[in-house]
Amino acid sequence: MAEVSSAPVRRPFHRRRKTCPFSGANAPRIDYKDVRLLQRYISERGKIVPSRITAVSQKKQRELAQAIKRARFLGLLPYVVS
């Protein structure tokens, strides 16, 4: 006879699927002049935060990176935070 353990059965943890903050009806547009928006996607060290952390879609992540690089080139954002 097989013994039945008395340990409680754990339900699997379901992580809520993140949605892209730039998709949808009233989503903000990615613009290199909008420094406040771009700073939310830059780390404390000045690096661009990856999309797996920010949940930005692949297409919008490329647009975001291009806007950040453009703003850096124009001097609106720093390359390195000192």
Curated annotation (Swiss-Prot):
A GO biological process held by the record: translation
SUPFAM superfamilies listed in its UniProt record: Ribosomal protein S18
GO MF annotation: an example: small ribosomal subunit rRNA binding
Keywords recorded for this protein, A-Z: Ribonucleoprotein, Ribosomal protein, RNA-binding, rRNA-binding
GO cellular component: cytosolic small ribosomal subunit
Family assignment from sequence similarity: Belongs to the bacterial ribosomal protein bS18 family.
NCBIfam families found in the cross-reference section: S18
Functional summary from the UniProt entry: Binds as a heterodimer with protein bS6 to the central domain of the 16S rRNA, where it helps stabilize the platform of the 30S subunit.
Subunit structure: Part of the 30S ribosomal subunit. Forms a tight heterodimer with protein bS6.
Listed name of the protein: Small ribosomal subunit protein bS18
